From Swiss-Prot:
InterPro entries: Cyt_b/b6_C, Cyt_b/b6_C_sf, Cyt_b/b6_N, Cytb/b6-like_sf, Cytochrome_b, Cytochrome_b_C_euk/bac, Cytochrome_b_N_euk/bac, Di-haem_cyt_TM. The gene is mt-cyb. A ubiquinone binds at residue 201. It comes from Poeciliopsis occidentalis. This is Cytochrome b. Binds 2 heme b groups non-covalently. SUPFAM superfamilies: a domain/subunit of cytochrome bc1 complex (Ubiquinol-cytochrome c reductase), Transmembrane di-heme cytochromes.
Amino acid sequence: MASLRKSHPLLKIANNALVDLPAPINISAWWNFGSLLGLCLIAQILTGLFLAMHYTSDISTAFSSVAHICRDVNYGWLIRNMHANGASFFFICIYLHIGRGLYYGSYLYKETWNVGVVLLLLVMMTAFVGYVLPWGQMSFWGATVITNLLSAVPYMGDTLVQWIWGGFSVDNATLTRFFAFHFLLPFIGAAATLVHLIFLHETGSNNPTGLNSDADKISFHPYFSYKDILGFTFLLTALIALALFSPNLLGDPENFTPANPLVTPPHIKPEWYFLFAYAILRSIPNKLGGVLALLASILVLMVVPLLHTSKQRSLTFRPFTQVLFWLLIADVAILTWIGGMPVEHPFIIIGQVASFLYFSLFLVLAPTAAWMENKILGW
């Protein structure tokens, strides 16, 4: 008789996804980030739930309710610091996960990849509306600047902005709806994660060689379940260390000042994980052009599978394209730095060159290098 985990209608789904799943024997620690992202999502939902029990989404009390959580609620300071820094770790894991996908050609699983890009957009949206909730100076002005970008939409832009604001400026209605969205979106993200996994399990995981590994698979449990738990301990140790020792390291000092519509901060900038996209937005001196570039900076990931010209899947044995990959990593780091700098010489031109290089690498240089490698290998 089959064991319960293999016969029960619900347990067998979990069994096929987490226990008896055939996994390639040679996947490295770079394949840990999917499960780490699942852990981040669970941690964010749990800490967020406890924060929502004490938070009030009203402009007169939002800032003081966050102070109340940190001062008066049992371990409120820890929950708040874990949630705020958990977002940073979420994005670190996302960017490493995407980088792994680009390096090893995982994007050729087109459905999995495209659902992943949608997930990235969902997480970015969630983080943006969440940053507005403490109602500090950078919360307010960040919301004002970013929502205002929608006014660049032809014909209906102004109406669209006022519709999102719920009035003629970022006000109480805006905060209330942003709280509603911030509560809802992670659950939509959890559902999209399941879709992501369903598509992944249709094909099975890729591996560092980029070759078919059907002939050499091992069960997910115990091998990769324990490997994932090791990753969990590293992630949680780092998160707790940051939350306890340096909780404000990645935040903006402006957000310790309550929101004031009459005083504009000298430098309006988003959290560090959006700076690369913000730099691309600012590098185009036209409002609509900037908004389109901002969107394209993320949506360019969707065209990567269409521009795969190489006969090999992974970059493991492709030195030319490897150089371009690391150039992309350096370029994103430069864009992140530029995004946090004021709009003045020499930062403007550096940002424009880095933005041009960012799109060139995806759309022109990488496909060309792959084509050249095919020629050199006589394929």
